[in-house]
Amino acid sequence: MKELPKIYEPQQVEGRVYQMWMDHDCFKAEPDPDKKPFSIVMPPPNVTGQLHMGHAMDSTLQDILTRFKRMQGYSALWLPGTDHAGIATQIKVEEELRTKEGLTRYDLGREKFLQRVWQWKEKYGNRIVEQQKKMGASCDWSRSRFTMDEGCSKAVRETFCELYDKGLIYKGSRIINWCPHCLTALSDAEVEYVDKPGHLWYIRYPLSDGSGDIVVATTRPETMMGDTGVAVNPEDEKFKHLIGKTCILPIMNREIPIVGDEYCEIGFGTGAVKMTPAHDPNDFEVGLRHNLEVIRVIADDGTINENGGKYNGMDRYECRKAIVKDLEEQGYLIKTEPYSHNVGTCYRCHNDVEPLISAQWFVKMEPLAKEAIRVVNDGTIKFVPERFTKTYINWMENVHDWCISRQLWWGHQIPAWYCDECGHINVKRDDPTECEKCGCKHLTREEDVLDTWFSSALWPFSTMGWPDLDSPDLKYWYPTSVMVTGYDIIFFWVARMIFSGMEQMKKEPFKTVFIHGLVRDDKGRKMSKSLGNGIDPLEMAEKYGADALRFNLITGNSPGNDMRFYVEKCEAMRNFCNKIWNASRFVMMNLTIDHVELPKKLELEDKWILSKLNTLIREVTDNMDAFELGVASAKIYDFIWDNYCDWFIELTKNRLNSDDQTTRENAQNVLCYVLIETLKLLHPFMPFITEEIWQALPHEGEFLMLSKWPEYNEKFSFPAEEEAMQTVIEAITAIRARRNEMNVAPSKKVNYTVATAHADTFSAGIPFFTRLASASDVTIVPADAAIDADGKVEVDTHAARIFMPLAELVDFEKELARIAKEKANAEKQLAGIENKLKNEGFLAKAPEAVINGARADAEKLKALIEKLDASAAAMKK
């Protein structure tokens, strides 16, 4: 055994312990036919990334589950990796090029630019991996993957070709979401909708025959140069007679048809809708049904193109102002109304997204969605919490075709070649040398790359060796056991992994989707750069220790719900680490044994703690299995702090100081046994401190992290003894509280009289009253015995009436006078605060933190007054 230092210093322990695990391949997983498989694939963080609090929580949850299953005897694989993060990485490298060298990617050309990106990835891409290690991540780092490594690239190409051959990938002109800032297409899931104030402009379109006009309402007058029709509901009596006629498009003076379509809602707006098929997905569908012309007027960079007439070259929002002014001057603008509506924005740069007609590559979703819906509906895949099942199903039932092409250079280049002669598209697993249709040798490769999420969708099986179906890893660990992820990427990623797994593997990618919420600041706000409220997890880990941070992120955390991060809680969890450390040091300083074995004869307090531990083992295991990690951690915390440290250690001190060796060693064995089993339960949550303490205790095996998880054992269930000890603890707690209220020092010994029907229980507890309740003597009498209460204070518990002759220790009159004075002072302070809280001016002007502080002070004063009243009442009995 080694001696633990007086103070626990995580900075001195964590790096050394982690390296010890790495040196001994503790995280390495191998397919083992004698063990059950357990696997998690890490949601790959962006290669550009630095660890933020969301990563820290996500990683901690996965690590807890992996360590738990590893200790339960599973061959547990936690497979790490990073994502190439198309747009994010390209933007980073372009910024570096521009600021350091004054160059653009076009100055370098595609090949040289990609060389720069790979160099950047090699330099910075490992940063987040090292940060995860500091948090204690027990991944099998030897299997670390990258979404653009050779294996993943092969899987991407195979999937693309398979889906294309089945007709599930196609190229077509459709309305897509376009980011004019990032200059690329976005999938529906990459668009965030924000409620923005705007206007509704009512515009008059004159009828071609001069018989009047039709009025439309629009939020986007800048697109009207691309209008190719006006639609009305065929059942709308107001407009029926106009269907088939034409009207004149203001400003452009172009004749456009009026068509009848049920898409238009009677009574909504004016009932007439301008049709811009090139810039609105609904208009595009109406246009297909009525053969309307498609005229695009907004260019890729968000400016008006040559089809916009005199507005050519203007920014789209400048054009809006100009065209509204022209419409007003020419008499076409009827009225303007304020109007708040949802505007699509880019998830990365937050600029407004532009719906554009564009030739892009798409995945046909309807056939793929069917199986992806079935495996969730029939329970093959379970969501935790279950409420997210509905969210997932609803999205999958209404899913649109997925736009997978991106106008970037960094990413998986689409494996399609256009024949320069006949225009045929050649999609091949290997680079073709000639056109499969006409034999022409001149082929031009598609420049677009695939959406980053395309490769991420294959992650559960591409990382296991697919498309090699004989891969030992794939056979053993697929389907994976759990996917741990945030609710914000159910559509981006979870849904796509499910339909990809069902299509490529004919098997679900995971059994359970464990959803967690976001980590918010202490005011409940999302952490962001713009608010400046982000908290660096590595700073917290450096200051308080990784274990304290991990425990903070888990305790009180429930599946699917956001959590607020309080720095003060990190401090509290560091105090918890210190409590465990000090308790362990106390145990070790009293150890003379070098092997732990429970004694055959157990005392009352031994049976109590073993029974409590046994219940804890069952409750922690059950909650871990149910993914209620926050509940499990809270139960461990309460057991260690209350049952073990505050009570059991104190209850054993008499025996530890006994002259009898057997008595001493029996106490040591139980203390040590309970500590070791508790360290095992705590280990997945706090891996560093538990391993360090365990290594210093008598133990079997090399590492705590590879030791056997405790199991519930009926032979350690002692309900009668547990109840008896709890009765004694309740009595001691009540006595201490009353003595504290009356300012009786612990050094003052008291002769207690206990009136109870549980004489045996209290007789067995006499040594504990002596040590923990400052008893000089304990007299036990029947529950109905007549007690002379003169000069005594009575304390009642569920099992006894306890009388304390405190008159000889306390000057009641003097103490009552002191209490009355303290109460009067507290009441005066309380009245002042309550008056302030009734003042409307104070409530309107004071910062929220000040108001909350005043309310908290008022509650503290109320509690103090209540306590003083109780003390006075006790003395007056």
Where in the sequence are the language-model features?
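Structured ligand/cofactor/substrate-binding pocket environments in proteins
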Residues: 54-66, 73, 82-83, 152-155, ...
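Secondary-structure transition/capping motifs at alpha-helix termini
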Residues: 67-75, 96-106, 130, 134-139, ...
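Active-site-adjacent bridging/hinge elements
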Residues: 34-42, 64, 97-104, 129-136, ...
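Short, polar/flexible loop-turn hinges at active-site or ligand-entry regions and domain interfaces
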Residues: 99-115, 382-383, 538, 559-571, ...
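Feature 926 captures the class I aminoacyl-tRNA synthetase adenylation module centered on the KMSKS loop
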Residues: 202, 394-454, 458, 503-546, ...
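Short hydrophobic beta-strand segments
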Residues: 37-43, 49, 274, 424, ...
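Short Cys/His-rich metal-coordination motifs, predominantly Zn2+-binding knuckles/fingers
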Residues: 182, 252, 349, 420-422, ...
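N-terminal, positively charged nucleic-acid-binding surface of large information/translation enzymes
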Residues: 1-235, 259, 276-289, 293-308, ...
